[in-house]
Amino acid sequence: MTLEWWFAYLLTSIILSLSPGSGAINTMTTSLNHGYRGAVASIAGLQTGLAIHIVLVGVGLGTLFSRSVIAFEVLKWAGAAYLIWLGIQQWRAAGAIDLKSLASTQSRRHLFQRAVFVNLTNPKSIVFLAALFPQFIMPQQPQLMQYIVLGVTTIVVDIIVMIGYATLAQRIALWIKGPKQMKALNKIFGSLFMLVGALLASARHA
């Protein structure tokens, strides 16, 4: 892979990571409700799910999955249902802003696992990666190293972007003056979770 091809993929990866989706919403809500440490656990979970998708694409299962309507539909509805459930939980969340008490109700391990599931149950992610990676793979060069470079680039970029979303959420938290504002913010993010879930449910297999 040439440096020019890598820069082209880097730009593509940045644009894709910046696009608001379930991962960004999950990171911001976790940062708001559980603080920066909770957000770090969530980001680690998102990258674990993304890494699993990348490995599946690298061994060829991504292409097989993208051609299976049944597998796509099963994962799609599981992901949509999970996001809508998260949205309902977020909508009903209390307006508390005491991060110490919140940390005791949901451990960082739970936040990590939740984030892994958010990414794993997004079939559009693995289908998109299966279509995107081959566009930047040079067949005359060793493919394994190229897949590793693309995968590491994807994860590093997404980590940086998600840290940005978590930081943005912390900035928003500075403007929250009481439980009523926090409750309203939880309803907004809960609605966004449900919206993304509905959009995922409406996705069609290519």
UniProtKB/Swiss-Prot annotation:
One Gene Ontology molecular-function label: threonine efflux transmembrane transporter activity
Keyword tags: Cell membrane, Membrane, Transmembrane, Transmembrane helix, Transport
Topology in the lipid bilayer: Multi-pass membrane protein
One GO BP: homoserine transport
Cell location: Cell membrane
InterPro entries linked to this entry: Homoserine/Threonine_efflux (IPR004778), LeuE-type (IPR001123)
Function recorded in the entry: Conducts the efflux of homoserine and homoserine lactone.
The name this protein goes by in its record: Homoserine/homoserine lactone efflux protein
Source organism of the structure: Escherichia coli (strain K12)
The organism's taxonomic lineage, starting at the top: Bacteria, Pseudomonadati, Pseudomonadota, Gammaproteobacteria, Enterobacterales
